[in-house]
């Protein structure tokens, strides 16, 4: 279900301002574009992004992950390593499997313990100069685990790996500060 405020905003848009964004100079297009850019500004503030132009709208987290994985084909090479956790949702597994298939990279799984927590010591051992990307869920809706993404990002950055954080379940429940996290991508 959707909050009433969301339903009302969508209804108002379709009744009063439905037009292509950034595609016209007529009144409806201008209003739709202003609303779109205002939303970008609000999201930027919500996650403390240093620049609203770093906010990219997609249909959802799955599409965002697919977009990133599809964009990295020329940066990932044979025997490079991509790390994900054993708790990932299918949408944060399959795109990386497909990227590995296209490039010859190796997908490695970060183990978790019986409580559903990342074995952080094993993770830090797994991150090497071959690691090109680390993609992990911030908060697992199946296990209830809140991952130590600050530590995960820091270890990845020490090896110049790209960091992708799946925030689909966390952004609505936890304070997210992308400047403090210093991740490359935070998706929700």
Can you annotate each of these PLM segments?
Residues 1-188:
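Pyridoxal 5′-phosphate
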């Amino acid at each position: 279900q959707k909050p009433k405020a969301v339903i009302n905003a969508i209804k108002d848009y379709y009744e009063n301002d439905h037009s292509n964004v950034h595609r016209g100079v007529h009144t409806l297009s201008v209003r739709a574009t202003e609303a779109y850019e205002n939303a970008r500004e609000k999201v930027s503030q919500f996650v403390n992004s240093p620049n609203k132009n770093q906010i990219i709208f997609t249909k959802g987290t799955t599409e965002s992950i697919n977009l990133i994985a599809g964009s990295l084909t020329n940066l990932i090479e044979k025997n490079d390593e991509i790390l994900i956790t054993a708790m990932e949702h299918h949408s944060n597994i399959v795109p990386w499997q497909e990227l590995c298939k296209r490039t010859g990279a190796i997908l490695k799984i970060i183990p978790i313990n019986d409580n559903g927590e990342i074995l952080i010591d094993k993770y830090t051992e797994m991150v090497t100069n071959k690691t090109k990307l680390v993609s992990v869920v911030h908060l697992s809706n199946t296990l209830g685990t809140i991952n130590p993404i600050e530590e995960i990002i820091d270890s990845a950055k020490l090896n110049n790996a790209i960091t992708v954080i799946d925030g689909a379940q966390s952004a609505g429940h936890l304070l997210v500060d992308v400047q403090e996290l210093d991740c490359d991508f935070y998706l929700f």
